[in-house]
């Protein structure tokens, strides 16, 4: 529960804390694991919704598979953050956060191997390799791997953001810079991951991935995940070896005995009653933002394959068109990540000039306009005459790629500002940064559960496409933008003196 800050004397006072300020280059290295994690996340976002439909799960139920992510994140990230808060820095050679970062990365590596080889393992369990058949064994293996992958993602990113908050000592400016570094590495991981997903020749480099139960598209997925493991191992090692964690946590955390056994969920949900209005506004805007983002995350490449390229993973006669659309969608997401990276670089200047709340609100309104544009493109494409080859008109493809690209700017803001605002606003409440990130995570995963449960029925109710989910996304994004502009501070956030804790 929150604790009143104490003055604490001695040599480890404010002056000493200022001397021990972590250089920005070390913060940059500490954030590098985001590249490895996001490389796999990009593959997951661009390729796994189409892949699970190839295994036999209908489009209407594909979103339910993604329940694994928010349900695991609902407890895993707050629990990991809580546990890492409770570890004394000197109790582990790697400190408080880095053991969880390393363990989460190991879980991701095991998960992508499981997902990548799910078709082969399903064949061992008796699946048929007849085209169009439902592969129950592969689906079960896939779901286990998918669940483990989301557990690993949550177990890695939460402690990493808390690690950065520890290193910046909750200085608002340095915290925003650290989170911008994190977003920059996420952008780099996205660019590499989506470029990997857009390339169709990985099976030629890893020929052993093609098997009787794993076609060329499956082998490309498998090969991409093997590359993911290599990048993940390298970036995790860089982060873990980047900098020693602070040994002095301040009196508010040092006074907390490691033997105290408060019930985790009680502390998590009990902390809500201490939240001030600005904290609640951050959580509300975060929730609305993710109601906007999650339909796009679920169906971006599927939308390109179905609505733009008029393909389907279920119909062998148009499966190739679907895969062409998925690869074009991956290319669009790569362009999205380029703009995401550029926005991450200039984000600190934007926040200093206009204020974090206004920047966040404007980005949400831009999101809403992009989702409306996707609805317009869907309607136009549906009513156009395509050439006999079935290739969509160039103008439609370019318009789709432009929308995908523009969405990179608000995505960079979503990956940075909410975490920086939460980290700076919970300090006065006396909450550990790990628990703070876990609480913010609740505002992310609960909307994802709502969208995962609702998007399938919405789509079926209105004809089986992706348009209804995007309409909900546009409305939620617009409302979130208005709330951010009206309810979050618009003044520039000045850098605080380090003279108190």
Swiss-Prot record:
It comes from the Eukaryota. One of its GO terms (molecular function) is sucrose:proton symporter activity. It is a multi-pass membrane protein. It holds the Pfam family MFS_1. Responsible for the transport of sucrose into the cell, with the concomitant uptake of protons (symport system). May also transport other glucosides. Belongs to the glycoside-pentoside-hexuronide (GPH) cation symporter transporter (TC 2.A.2.4) family. This is Sucrose transport protein SUT2. It comes from Oryza sativa subsp. indica.
């Amino acid at each position: 529960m929150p604790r009143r800050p104490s003055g604490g004397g001695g040599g480890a006072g404010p002056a000493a804390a200022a001397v021990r300020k972590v250089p920005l280059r070390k913060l940059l290295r500490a954030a590098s694991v985001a590249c490895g994690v996001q490389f796999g996340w990009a593959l997951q976002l661009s390729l796994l919704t189409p892949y699970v439909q190839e295994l036999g799960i209908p489009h209407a139920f594909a979103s339910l598979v993604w329940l694994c992510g928010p349900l695991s994140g609902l407890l895993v990230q707050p629990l990991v953050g809580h546990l890492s808060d409770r570890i004394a820095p000197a109790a582990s050679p790697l400190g408080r956060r880095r053991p969880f970062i390393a363990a989460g990365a190991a879980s991701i590596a095991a998960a992508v191997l499981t997902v990548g080889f799910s078709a082969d393992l399903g064949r061992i369990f008796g699946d048929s390799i007849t085209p169009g058949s439902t592969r129950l064994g592969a689906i079960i293996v896939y779901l286990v791997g998918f669940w483990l992958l989301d557990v690993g993602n949550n177990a890695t990113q939460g402690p990493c953001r808390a690690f950065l908050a520890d290193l910046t000592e909750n200085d608002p400016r340095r915290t925003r810079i650290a989170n911008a570094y994190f977003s920059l590495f996420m952008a780099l991981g996205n660019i590499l991951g989506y470029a990997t997903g857009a390339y169709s020749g990985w099976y030629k480099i890893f020929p052993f991935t093609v098997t009787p139960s794993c076609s060329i598209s499956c082998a490309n997925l498998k090969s991409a995940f093997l590359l993911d493991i290599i990048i993940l191992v390298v970036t995790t090692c860089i982060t873990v070896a980047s900098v020693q964690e602070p040994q002095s946590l301040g009196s508010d955390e040092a006074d907390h005995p490691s033997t105290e056994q408060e019930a985790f969920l009680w502390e998590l949900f009990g902390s809500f009653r201490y939240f001030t209005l600005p904290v609640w506004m951050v959580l509300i805007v975060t929730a609305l933002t993710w109601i906007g983002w999650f339909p796009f995350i679920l169906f971006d490449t599927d939308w390109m394959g179905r609505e733009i390229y008029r393909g389907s993973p279920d119909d062998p006669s148009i499966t190739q068109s679907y895969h062409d659309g998925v690869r074009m969608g991956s290319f669009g997401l790569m362009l999205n990540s380029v703009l995401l990276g550029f926005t991450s670089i200039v984000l600190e200047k934007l926040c200093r000039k206009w204020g974090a709340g206004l920047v966040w609100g404007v980005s949400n309104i831009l999101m809403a306009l992009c989702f409306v544009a996707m609805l317009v493109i869907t309607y136009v494409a549906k009513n156009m005459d395509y050439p006999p080859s079935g290739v969509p008109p160039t103008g439609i493809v370019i318009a789709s790629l432009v929308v995908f690209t523009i969405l990179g700017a608000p995505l960079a803001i979503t990956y940075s500002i909410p975490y920086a605002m939460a980290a700076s606003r919970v300090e006065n409440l006396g909450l550990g940064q790990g628990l703070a990130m876990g609480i913010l995570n609740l505002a992310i995963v609960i909307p994802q559960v709502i969208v995962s449960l609702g998007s399938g029925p919405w789509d079926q109710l209105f004809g089986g496409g992706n348009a209804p989910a995007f309409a909900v996304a546009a409305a939620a994004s617009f409302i979130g933008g208005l709330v951010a502009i009206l309810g979050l501070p618009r003044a520039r956030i000045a850098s605080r003196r380090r003279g108190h804790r």
